[in-house]
A protein has these predicted regions:
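Terminal C-lobe "cap" of eukaryotic-type protein kinase domains
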Residues: 221-246
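Conserved short submotifs of the Hanks-type protein kinase catalytic core
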Residues: 56-69
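Catalytic-loop of the protein kinase fold
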Residues: 98-114
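ATP-binding glycine-rich loop module of kinase domains
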Residues: 3, 7-27
Length: 336
């Protein structure tokens, strides 16, 4: 699609990548990549540094040079934390792409690399599209990493792409990482043969957290609507990386108490109204409710997960009995 050259930027005092359009290549693909990278701000996505113009026309751009190692399969045995952090970086990058209304459309190991500081970066957005325009009559795909639905054109002759395409490609990439660089032979067929539900990650038995294996397997579902959103994958992986590190601060009448891994359970009661909250290492969950209880003015039931800052009300205000308790949940960050 483009000619790529590594150059030294004397102003930035570092190497950069210069991408210019190859003769005879569709300019729109270069513009799609530039547009995508200019829109997205993420520590896990390569950044555009400058635009190159000739006679007022864009002919190329400058992006950061990723000078670290290519991604490789994880050598077994590996710690659960190593696996979770590896996959989290990829999931977070794709999630950020989707949060900016973009699709990557070519997620695979070759399009990722670690920078000098060890942060994984996703690059090569030449096939990237806005969610609202992610369709094409000409099908570009990478064998092994593309889901079955893109091989069937719609009545308008277009091949339609959704976020679920990137989710499937993430699932294959994750499997490649955990399975010694190998993926199922059926995935290379055109179209790929994908079972309705996957148990590939569960069979690997390298991820100790069952819910993580289940979620990763769901990324490889044949039906796109059964695949999770990347922000859901990012969230669960992050929760397990930070397991046991969360805190909830409860404040009532100037008095404070904390729920954390050392004190994981609390019960708050006013008359016949009460709520029990438990910390399971991943988050704070309502375990029991009696009488009139509201969280941020909404009725709550057992199983509800409390996030952020909320106000817990015990007692019906119309009955003259009301106690308000503030709850603040900490937001620890995944550090590399």
């Amino acid at each position: 699609m483009s000619d790529t050259l590594v150059c030294f930027d004397s102003n930035l005092q570092r190497n950069v990548v210069v991408k210019t359009l190859k003769p005879g290549i569709e300019k729109q693909r270069l513009m799609d990549e530039l547009s995508a990278l200019a829109d997205i701000r993420s520590k896990y996505v390569v950044q555009v540094l400058d635009v190159i113009k000739k006679d007022g026309d864009v002919v190329g751009f400058v992006e950061e040079y990723i000078d670290g190692n290519a991604i490789t399969p994880i050598a077994n045995p590996a710690s659960s934390d190593t696996i979770l952090r590896y996959l989290y970086s990829i999931a977070a990058g794709i999630s950020d792409v989707h949060d900016h209304g973009r699709l990557h459309r070519d997620i695979k190991p070759e399009n990722m690399r670690f920078d000098y500081g060890g942060t994984l970066k996703i690059f090569d957005f030449g096939l990237s599209k806005l969610n609202t325009s992610a369709k094409t009559k000409t099908l570009y795909f990478t064998p092994g990493y593309s889901p079955p639905e893109i091989f069937s054109a719609g009545v308008d002759g277009n091949h339609n792409f959704t976020e679920a395409v990137d989710v499937f490609s993430f699932g294959v990439t994750a499997y490649w990482i955990l399975n010694g660089g190998s993926i199922p032979a059926d995935f290379f067929k055109v179209p790929p043969i994908v079972p309705p539900t996957s148990s590939l990650f569960d069979a690997l038995a390298v991820v100790s957290e069952k819910s993580v294996s289940v979620l990763l397997d769901s990324c490889l579902c044949a039906e796109p609507s059964n695949r999770p959103a990347m922000r859901e994958v990012k969230s669960l992986l992050g929760d397990y990386i930070l397991k046991g590190q969360h805190k909830m601060l409860l404040t009532y009448n100037g008095q404070r108490s904390t729920i954390d891994i050392n004190k994981p359970n609390v019960s708050l009661t006013v008359g016949s109204n009460g709520i029990s909250i438990s910390y399971n290492g991943l988050g704070f969950v309502v375990s029991n409710v009696t009488g009139f209880v509201r969280i941020n003015n909404k009725q709550v039931a057992a199983g509800h997960r409390i996030k952020g800052s909320v106000v817990i009300v015990l007692g019906d205000p119309s009955g003259g009995i009301k106690t308000s308790i503030t709850a603040d949940v900490s937001h620890p960050e995944v550090m590399h």
